[in-house]
């Protein structure tokens, strides 16, 4: 009986740690972006004494990439979002201490919508820790942040529209001046979902193989590439000599060329089964 009680307590404890209520969580969103727009968010957090230890707790109803001082904090292609049954919002707590650079930290998030509900709960983020004197600090995503529509849009499941002419390579930079950026607003979505802490049990998406096409066939409709096997991932196309504004389609995605010497055309938030 004692063994059963201990096991029951452990299960209950795991459940409490794994899920928490959304009550009190602050959500922000772009004030004017459409439901298909991907969004850049950013904020500089300053302290009087150099920061020594820090964590970020972040959640979104979409998929996202998280950067601290210009560096991607995880090796995954993206993080997020609502689980497949749309009953929980995934939340992550990440130790970002190794990315700290003194008294100022630049946090940047690239958000992409995925929710079928069209929620404007685009980002919830808390940044907290202690400085070199042991003094705690805390900041959260709120109206003091900056936001801007990104250079891509998510038009539907497995479908991204990418416009390289609108890409700003400094969007997550520590040097960017946010002259043409906007302030975000609080979410108007009143529906609450439990937050699922995905940090302890999270199995990240990892790139395991890089495949090259084994055959290609060109006709009047375009070029078909055969990779010789089925795979779960995405296609990256290297373009050379493409003119700015030229448009191409690959799979269900569209791409507007930026006119760079070597361009990489690929979806940032879409992984599909292909051959």
Protein language model annotation of sequence segments:
Residues 21-275:
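Extracellular/oxidizing-compartment recognition motifs
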Residues 1-22:
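Bacterial Sec-dependent N-terminal signal peptides
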């Amino acid at each position: 009986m004692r063994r059963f009680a201990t096991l029951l307590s452990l299960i209950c404890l795991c459940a409490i740690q794994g899920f928490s209520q959304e009550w009190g969580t602050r959500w922000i969103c772009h004030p004017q972006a459409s439901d298909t727009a991907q969004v850049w968010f950013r904020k500089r957090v300053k302290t009087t004494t150099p920061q020594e230890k820090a964590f970020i707790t972040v959640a979104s109803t979409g998929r996202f990439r998280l950067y601290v001082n210009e560096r991607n904090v995880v090796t995954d292609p993206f993080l997020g979002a609502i689980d497949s049954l749309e009953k929980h919002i995934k939340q992550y707590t990440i130790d970002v201490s190794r990315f700290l650079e003194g008294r100022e930290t630049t946090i940047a998030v690239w958000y992409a919508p995925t929710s079928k509900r069209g929620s404007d709960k685009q980002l919830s983020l808390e940044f907290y820790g202690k400085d070199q004197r042991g003094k705690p600090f805390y900041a959260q995503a709120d109206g003091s942040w900056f936001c801007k529509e990104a250079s891509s849009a998510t038009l539907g499941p497995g479908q991204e529209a990418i416009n390289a002419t609108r890409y700003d390579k400094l969007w997550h930079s520590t040097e960017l001046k946010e002259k043409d950026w906007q302030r975000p607003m609080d979410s108007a979505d009143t529906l609450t979902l439990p937050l699922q802490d995905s940090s302890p049990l999270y199995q990240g998406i990892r790139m395991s193989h890089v495949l090259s096409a084994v055959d290609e066939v060109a006709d009047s409709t375009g070029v078909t590439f055969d990779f010789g096997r089925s795979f779960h991932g995405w296609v990256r196309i290297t373009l050379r000599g493409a003119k700015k504004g030229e448009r191409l389609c690959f799979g269900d995605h569209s791409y507007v060329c930026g006119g760079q010497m070597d361009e990489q055309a690929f979806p940032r938030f879409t992984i599909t089964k292909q051959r």
